[in-house]
Amino acid sequence: MRDYVILTDSCCDLSAEMAAELGVEVLPLSLQMGDRTYRNYLDGREIGFHEFYERVRSGELATTSAVNVGEFEEKMREILKTGKDILSISFSSALSTTYQSSVIAAEELKDEFPDAKILTVDSLCASLGQGLFVYLCAQEQKKGKTIDEVKTFAEETKGRVCHWFTVDDLNHLKRGGRINAATALFGTMLAIKPVMHVDDEGRLIPVGKARGRKASLTALVDRMEATAIDPAGQTVFISHGDCLEDAEFVAGEVRRRLGVETVHINYVGPVIGNHSGPGTMALFFLGSER
């Protein structure tokens, strides 16, 4: 059996330390802010996470770019030359062209590496939902599962990776076209906070609302309580848009209410945070369905 590498992208929002511990390779997406282009590395080496959110708070605007075909080809070729196969797990195709780039790159490399396997997975996930999904696949790899077995596991599992989140400022979603201007205006005036999720097709969908910040954070835990499978026995991921105190509140609630023992907290990275804004709070877990 040939050895293989799990390859993903920086929208997984894993910490650099966890990615290294899992042994996964990570390709960065890019962010254009001011007159500079930054690569969204997991360790924040080109733009720090707090720095990014402070610049957004000050009114700076940014645009983002997916991983392109050439970047995938370069990284995949580097891995294949070591004699290893590749399981590529990408940011949701409903939110980025990164997955499509991985598929094209894999096809382009087939003739050059005819004996290699390059399997691609559309995670239909985002942020630490994608991170949780990659984490689960890496755990299967560590158990000695083959690349085909982990690919099957991935396809069977991705529809149960639940993403629930809220934002603090509706204007960021308005700018990204997720809600209209009137909704943003009245929501802000009334302190309405949306409760949103990523659906079975990998799309970001508003499904409810709460009056006030604390109510919106509690609503995330309510959603987990309603759909989580064996919450006390699973690893839960939480990501935040530079609001660690709120993330710790949610972590405390899932521990208190659901008996969860293992919680990992990290930033919503700049690429996704550019669309959701400072104050984004997201909870990720395995459920019976999304």
Region annotations inferred by a language model:
Residues R2-D3, C11-E25, S30-Q32, R36, ...:
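Mixed-charge interfacial surface used for oligomerization/domain docking
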Residues V5-A66, E71:
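N-terminal glycine-rich anion-binding loop in soluble enzyme alpha/beta folds
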Residues E46-Y53, M76, K81, E108:
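A short glycine/small-residue-enriched secondary-structure motif
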Residues R57-L95, Q100-A105, K151:
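Glycine-rich phosphate- or other oxyanion-binding loops that anchor nucleotides, phosphorylated ligands
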